[in-house]
């Protein structure tokens, strides 16, 4: 009886540790999904239009190319 009780307590502790670890992971994943398809993010998609405008000169691109080589 004592052994069964000890196994039960240990398994409950391990299960609690597992649930807390996964809750952190799933919580971060849910926040990412929510921010990707939420009302605010869908409304503010036009802020990414400026990402594709190249304000870099040829000299800047050459310097970046040299840095990454």
Swiss-Prot record:
Propiece residue ranges: 41-69
Location of this chain's protein in the cell: Secreted; Target cell membrane
Keywords per UniProt: Amidation, Antibiotic, Antimicrobial, Cleavage on pair of basic residues, Cytolysis, Hemolysis, Membrane, Secreted, Signal, Target cell membrane, Target membrane, Transmembrane
Summary of the tissues where the protein is detected: Expressed by the venom gland.
Signal peptide (residue range): 1-23
Source domain of life: Eukaryota
The keyword Acetylation is assigned to this record: no
GO cellular-component term (any): membrane
Swiss-Prot/TrEMBL GO biological process terms: defense response to bacterium; killing of cells of another organism
Further remark: Is highly capable of inhibiting antibiotic-resistant pathogen growth, including methicillin-resistant S.aureus. In vivo, shows high antimicrobial activity on a S.aureus-infected mouse model.
Role played: Antimicrobial peptide that is rapidly bactericidal against Gram-positive bacteria.
Family of this protein: Belongs to the non-disulfide-bridged peptide (NDBP) superfamily. Short antimicrobial peptide (group 4) family.
Protein name stated in the entry: Amphipathic peptide StCT2
Organism: Scorpiops tibetanus (Scorpion)
Phylogenetic lineage: Eukaryota, Metazoa, Ecdysozoa, Arthropoda, Chelicerata
